[in-house]
Amino acid sequence: MVIIRLARGGAKKRPFYSIVVADKRSKRDGRYIEQLGFFNPIAAGGEVPLRIDMERANYWLSQGAQPSERVAQLFKSYSA
């Protein structure tokens, strides 16, 4: 099964997440199929907090990929 989820990056106490399409069995930060965007929860100033390639996200959703709860919330906030 394919899932769209967040993969953590960044430094200690400075999280930065990549929105990735991955096999459900792979590790959180492990191998992924495609990167769809990023989420920066502590963006400051002129930094972009969220970027998603919605065209590719819609493709993966049409192929049966299941978004995690947090990614589904991010999709809603990005499209609004």
Swiss-Prot record:
Q: Name one GO biological process term.
A: translation
For the keyword Ribonucleoprotein, the answer is yes
Supply the HAMAP family for this chain.
Ribosomal_bS16
Identification of the protein by name? Small ribosomal subunit protein bS16
The record, for PROSITE patterns, names: RIBOSOMAL_S16
What keywords would UniProt list here? Ribonucleoprotein, Ribosomal protein
Of the GO CC terms on this record, one is: small ribosomal subunit
Q: Which residues form a coiled coil?
A: none
Per its UniProt record, what NCBIfam families does this chain match? S16
Regarding protein family, the annotation reads: Belongs to the bacterial ribosomal protein bS16 family.
Q: Upper taxonomic classification of the species?
A: Bacteria, Pseudomonadati, Pseudomonadota, Gammaproteobacteria, Chromatiales
InterPro entries xrefs: Ribosomal_bS16, Ribosomal_bS16_CS, Ribosomal_bS16_dom_sf
Gene Ontology MF terms: structural constituent of ribosome
Organism of origin is: Nitrosococcus oceani (strain ATCC 19707 / BCRC 17464 / JCM 30415 / NCIMB 11848 / C-107)
SUPFAM superfamilies assigned = Ribosomal protein S16 (SSF54565)
